[in-house]
């Protein structure tokens, strides 16, 4: 598929965070940054998305990665939703690669190391994608914010093999694939994402455990799951849900894990 068509299909998902009125509290105003025109993906990002789609369709004939077969629907349903979450989690300033870790100015701290081509590991944001499956939203988030350290948690061996092939083919660095159940993970992460998992309540509790205190938990879920999420994790400071573009029922729900005393 041509890069121009991919960019066109993804444009609605890369608009400013506040374009949807229903995602804001009464009286809340949009930051000036969020009123800008939709972000523009680079040629490299678009090429990687195209390669990813080809891999997904080829592997999907052998293992069940997605029920969606149409390329354009794959772009809007999988990549669009994932990049929508990416822009909310890591809103761009001068470029998609500049973002701030909790309590730490990432762009300034790494100014010298960026010039040398190395990144200080102590300031790299760690993001875990729980139940990663075909890699959504974790890998598209990595394509958007390449400086993060990404962990893909997937217990299914065949799906984990697919994830390794995607990471290799896209030449992604600082990506760790954990082929095990999330309950067996002892590491914690600044950001944990969750999308389309079984046993939703149990997965939520595991995701919260994997999130560092003051870290963020990001859920791409159906609106019917909103009450379950909020009641299952009442200790999370949830932001108002944000509707996903071009969907009647999908939402992005982001919350901060409140430190316990």
Task: Go through each PLM region and give its residues.
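Short glycine-aspartate micro-motif
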Residues: 127-129, 150
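Intrinsic disorder/low-complexity segments
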Residues: 1-46, 90-126, 258-261
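S-adenosylmethionine
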Residues: 36, 136-138, 143-261
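Class I SAM-dependent transferase core
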Residues: 1-16, 39-93, 128, 158-159, ...
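Class I SAM-dependent methyltransferase "Motif I" SAM/SAH-binding loop
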Residues: 131-135
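Generic detector of short, well-ordered, non-transmembrane alpha-helical segments enriched
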Residues: 26-27, 32-34, 52, 188, ...
């Amino acid at each position: 598929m041509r890069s121009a068509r991919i960019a066109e299909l993804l444009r609605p998902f890369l608009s400013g965070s506040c374009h949807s009125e229903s995602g804001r509290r009464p009286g809340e105003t949009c930051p000036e940054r969020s009123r800008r025109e939709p972000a523009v993906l680079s040629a490299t990002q678009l090429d990687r998305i195209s390669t990813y789609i080809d891999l997904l369709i080829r592997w999907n004939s052998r293992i069940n990665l997605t029920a969606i077969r149409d390329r354009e629907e794959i772009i809007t349903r999988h990549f669009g939703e994932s990049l929508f979450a990416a822009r909310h989690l890591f809103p761009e300033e001068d470029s998609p690669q500049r973002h701030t870790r909790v309590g730490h100015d990432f762009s300034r701290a790494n100014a010298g190391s960026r010039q040398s081509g190395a990144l200080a590991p102590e300031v790299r944001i760690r993001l875990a994608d729980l139940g990663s499956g075909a890699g959504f939203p974790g890998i598209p988030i990595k394509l958007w914010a390449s400086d993060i350290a990404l962990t893909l948690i997937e217990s299914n061996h065949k799906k984990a093999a697919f994830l390794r092939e995607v990471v290799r083919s896209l030449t992604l660095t600082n990506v760790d694939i954990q082929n095990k159940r999330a309950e067996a993970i002892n590491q914690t992460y600044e950001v944990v994402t969750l999308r389309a998992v079984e046993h939703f309540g149990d997965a939520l509790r595991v995701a919260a455990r994997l999130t560092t205190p003051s870290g963020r938990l990001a859920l791409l879920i159906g609106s019917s799951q909103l009450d379950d999420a909020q009641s299952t994790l009442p200790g999370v400071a949830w932001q108002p849900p944000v509707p996903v573009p071009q969907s009647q029922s999908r939402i992005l729900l982001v919350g901060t894990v409140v430190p316990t005393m």
